[in-house]
Amino acid sequence: MGPQVVASAPEPTRPPSGFVPVSGGGGTHVTQVHIQLAPSPHNGTPEPPRTAPEVGSNSQDGDATPSPPRAQPLVPVAHIRPLPTTVQAASPLPEEPPVPRPPPGFQASVPREASARVVVPIAPTCRSLESSPHSLVPMGPGREHLEEPPMAGPAAEAERVSSPAWASSPTPPSGPHPCPVPKVAPKPRLSGWTWLKKQLLEEAPEPPCPEPRQSLEPEVPTPTEQEVPAPTEQEVPALTAPRAPASRTSRMWDAVLYRMSVAEAQGRLAGPSGGEHTPASLTRLPFLYRPRFNARKLQEATRPPPTVRSILELSPQPKNFNRTATGWRLQ
């Protein structure tokens, strides 16, 4: 059962000093109560509220300091502070939080103020004196929530003003092994010109292993089997050695030079008595590009070639190249 607040015998008039003795039952410590009384708005002449000083073992004087009157009716609010640390250590902690109840003497002394509310918050007794006590400010009847308690001390108030909430740096995570958060650098955004250059200057993929020179022979008309000798010992390492990739034109020229070297080697082996035999593939160069279709050139190729006479034929009567008019003749 929570503590019951019992007041002294009610009096018809308000006490001059404004003291309200409060006691707790069941060995529960009750904190000090500071009550402010406000007149009812129905009275014609508002009376200045009386403030009761804190009741404790150290304060025994009953001097009351009247507060200036206000036009708006105030709600009676109790200022409660925890007991000293030495007293709290000697007494056991309560099992259940105390239930706030207004003193009956206060209700008997102010029966007319039906519209005013009584707010008597009880602070927990397990709190140390280092924490700032709740200082409640009397609010109007229209307010339904209490203001946030201010910071304790002027230094803390100045620190709160100088450093706002949004400027406060985030506290690192506490633990035995705090893991630092990796900072991800923003990815640089490429401009249009840089992106275009990257697309144009993109590296070509690595070419496959170059094929041997024998694979280039089908592009050129191949001679008979008798004309193609076996490769010599000097040419074998040249065929197997890897080379840089070449264009189609250079590969065709390599094939022509290879055939010429093969023909020369064959002529040397046959000797001068064997006679020279030039392969038909060496009479013309291979096509270095694909020819276009041309009808005029095809027509000229189909005509018979003109005959060239090496001996001039001389007639006995020379031919006259003079012209005569029509209807006239020479005598």
From Swiss-Prot:
Compositional bias of kind Pro residues: 94-105, 170-185
Region (Disordered): 1-112, 128-185, 204-247
Residue ranges with Low complexity bias: 149-169, 217-238
InterPro entries, per database record: DUF4643
Pfam families assigned to the protein according to its UniProt record, in alphabetical order: DUF4643
PANTHER family: PROLINE-RICH PROTEIN 33
Name this polypeptide is given: Proline-rich protein 33
Native source species: Homo sapiens
Lineage, highest ranks first: Eukaryota, Metazoa, Chordata, Craniata, Vertebrata
UniProt gene name: PRR33
